[in-house]
Amino acid sequence: MSAQELGKFGFSHLLELATFAPSGYESTMLIDSLHNGAQGALEVQILSYKGYAKVLQISAYALAFSQPITLTFFHPKPYIKRLFALDSVVFVQGVLRDDGGRLSMIQPKTIREINAIIPKFKTTHKNADMISLTQSLITQEALQECGLPSDVADSLVRIFHPDKEFFRIFCARKGFDEKTLYALKFCEIYCHLLRLSTKRTDYAAKYRCTGDYQSWVESLPFTLTNAQQRVCAQIASDLASHKAAKRLVMGDVGCGKTMVILASVMMAYPKKSLLMAPTSVLAKQLYEQALLYLPKSLNITYISAESKQDLQGLFASQVDFIIGTQALLYREISGEEIALVMSDEQHRFGVKQRHYLEKLAQVDSSSKPHILQFSATPIPRTMAMLESKMIDVSIIDELPYPKDITTTIISKPRFPELLAHISAEVQAARQVAIIYPLVEESQASEYLSLKEGESFWRTRFPQVYSTSGQDKEKEKVLEEFAQNGSILLATTLIEVGISLPKLSTIVIIAPEKLGLATLHQLRGRVSRNGLKGYCYLYTHTPDSARLREFAAHLSGFDIAQIDLKYRKGGDLLDGKRQSGAQWIWADLSEDEAIFDRANALLTDKKSIPKSNDSRDCGGAVGALHDF
């Protein structure tokens, strides 16, 4: 069968077909013992009819057991008596009922083929056609040629070519056993990883970059963590390659990714580097860090929406590193000398924005700049594994210093306790942030808005600052608060990247309305420099299991795993469905070991088989490289 014909059934590949398991089975095996619930076939002789109130009862005789049996039909059609003619001998298939020694079958079918287990598919196609399709294509040889291990292939074959023992176990468990479920999960994961790997396209690098970053690292007033050094080495290898780098660098809040960004600039030097950040506050903060730590010989420039600099002129001059916001996307830039393009907090940008940033530095279609994306929003290992098929992934899984943050769930009765804590922190010259869910009052919210709560805090504490995403002066407010403030009233705008070194406490109102990743980013604003930190979750639902799990874990990677359990994974292939399940059998939060095995198997493969043999996965049933 050709790939086109397979596509008529809605499948693009043999492995995809192999995960389309039957929803159930019917047995035409001859029943070998008469007991309640026995399913299968009996050879019977028709003796008489009895009809009443839209019910037809046919008295018959089970020949193999020499026992009477009643065949019952509700709302019988006229053809029933033709199928079960008096004195005829037929094979009937159904489920046996034993009512106190009186045997019966409800709505039995007449069959011509006996001693078979018939798969039943949920499909708009004819069941017979699906059986023909699966039984002709799904064989041990074909599945192993697709790369599946023999144990997985064997279990999958049994799904579509069931025997009596398989059917017995299926009926007893009312579903597939663990070995069969494992095979379905493995096949689905393997197929998905394979599809992702073919989505990746590599290009030649504009420049091979071999700048001496090690000397710069050794000159720093502190030592990079082992994780930072490992990731720097991975990036250095990328940038020295003839192939354009395409790498995502992930780490927890406070993992020190800024130093990895600056090290990457040193690797690219003397060629130029470009960095885009999601907000001007974060971009300016990165600019200040670059000025502080990079050699004074480097010319570093910050570009904001208000900047009047001529970028063409800048790049024609000796500028080495440009840092900016999305304003970079709307400026004329000569990208000839740009070797490295980076985006910080990459998830804050759309795919089109990141692509356009890359295009700024691309001179021709045959080569591309090195691309690095940075994120302080960890994702689970299984999702990182999926990402890694399209883009290289590095993980900074170590913090420069351990974070000491106590997370407490509170509700209204404990508000005085919270107030006392805030007073103590303010008196100790430490800062507090209070995060509101809304700026203005809303009838739909049971919580106070920022505007409603503002007067309460201003009458009790000095140096109270207030801002939100709607505030045009928010960046100025944040800067003033960082220098002089005691309490900051804000929305989630402080979620990403903002440095508030004196912030010891964050109070998040209505945390149940926020995603766990956002909660973790907000909590990560405190204890930035080893300061003892406190996070209070003020909620009307203190018994929330989701919030309790969040409060019990500090690691962003643990939080990502918990979030995955509640939210499920999005579709990495097409960028759709960032929430909601897309897997039929596998579970990203529970099947990590299966992901590891499938990924290792796929990584070990040097090539994908290609053949004109229709049994081959590279052949007519749908080549893997066609995904």
Which residue stretches match the model-derived regions?
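Helix-hairpin-helix
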Residues: M1-L17
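Conserved RecA-like ASCE P-loop NTPase motor core of nucleic-acid helicases/translocases
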Residues: L17, K272-T279, V432-L438
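Structural detector for short beta-strands of small beta-barrel domains
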Residues: I31-L56, G94
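Upstream accessory/linker segments immediately N-terminal to the RecA-like ATPase cores of bacterial MutS
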Residues: L56, A62-E218
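ASCE P-loop NTPase motor cores of helicases and related translocases
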Residues: D177-L329
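Conserved motor-coupling elements within RecA-like helicase/translocase cores
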Residues: A305-I322, L329-E336, D471-I487
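Post-DEXD/H (motif II) to motif III coupling segment of the RecA-like Helicase ATP-binding lobe
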Residues: G335-L340, Q346-V426
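C-terminal helicase module of SF1/SF2 nucleic-acid helicases/translocases
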Residues: F415-Q431, S449-F627
